[in-house]
Amino acid sequence: MKKLQRTLALVLASIILCLAFTSCSNTGKSIMTKTYTKSATESDGLNLASSATYITQDGKTKKSFSLKGKHEEIKYITVDFGDSVDFNTVVFGEAGKKVTLFEIYGSNEQDANYQFLYQSDCIEGGHTCFLGDVKYRYLRVFVNQSSGNYNVNSFEAYYLKNEKAKDLRVNAYFIAEDIKEDADFSNLDALTDVIVFGTAKFDGQGNIKFYDNDSNEVDEQYYADKVNLLKSKIGDRKINIITDIAMPYGDDNLDIKSMMNEQNVDNLVANIVDFVNKYGFDGYDMDYEFPEDKEDWKRFNNFLRKLDKAMPDKIISLAIAPWDLRFDDDVIKAIDRVEVMLYDMFTAHGYHSIFSTTVNGVNKAIKGGFSPEQIDLGLPFYSRPTNRLGYWGNYNQFGGKIDRYTNLIYFNDFDHDGNPMTAPQYINSVQMVADKTAFAIDAGLGGMMIWHYSCDLPYDDELSLFKAITDTKTAKQK
């Protein structure tokens, strides 16, 4: 499995990314501003906050939004739109990164009958809160928990719909080993694309070999049976099937350098094309996340040019970490999709994949040359512990402990090496997934990417994350 094969690399990457992605940077804030200015214009919507007044906890009325408090001081502010108005989206900004729990309530009376609407944890540089269609005159915004003195300094409210919401890609990695007759295939109803990952693996010459979950080499029929079973379960659903042949990661990635060098690259490309055609795949995805130097990037760009020329009518997809991108301009045009991995990136609180790191990562991918339409926003359907150790827990293992809003799960278990593990687990809840999906639509992104398919609850469960994506797409449509 990808996560087990690459534990060390991910832990090291998390340390690096923690320094770069712990909050929504100024560039991240700029994409939030651009997104909601553009979305409001296209939806004939207005920032309802522009004409609102704000009532402080002690009854004073202000023209601007500001919610400040001391460490662990619970405070609220009331937003008065002046009349009962329709809206579905609230956007907050914070100066700093101290808020760890906030809530939104709505009412048509200033001081009575407030209904709970929303809860989440971090705001930092920016947080889109997707509420669904609601209609209220008053909102009351609470900060319930913080790790220090806080300052929530911006508030926007919109009613945003988009006819393109229905076209948002939903692309999930499906680990080949997990394709079994007794697996849950109900979440296929949410998907437009699947990427079959693993079992097939490159060697240092670009040849393809096959391995089971215990790393034993097996006959190709073992892989073929998995693919055929998946195709039978997909049936007549309109789902693209893309293959991802596992990379030969190792010390200094010497086998990757070898398979892309001038001696082997043509063999590599030919083997990919033959493999894609043999199984009738709709495209090819490469999970080469960490080219290390100028020569690595030169080889990678050269390979992608050759691959695009060899299979121009197939989807070319790349899993990327959104930093230090050095794709040549012509190569960027040849890439159909980038699966932007916006997870395993920790805040100072030890939370991975919060909303603002997602915004920052998307912005970095755009700054790296990709158009929004090429970008699939990466979602983790798994947990990471707040102590950042190498443990990945499937979302569906927390049954009975999860609800729509809570991202922080208190869960005692053993890590992958059998050691006791007591640190809280951070997940992306149904609401967090809805928020990120709404943002992807508002920002004009091409789609969502999920690592990985088998982590979710069944599609008919009210806490299914795939269902959260579908429901948000539906709610955002004009």
Regions found by a protein language model. Give the residues of each.
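Glycan-binding loop/region signatures in secreted carbohydrate-active enzymes
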Residues: 374-439, 459, 465-478
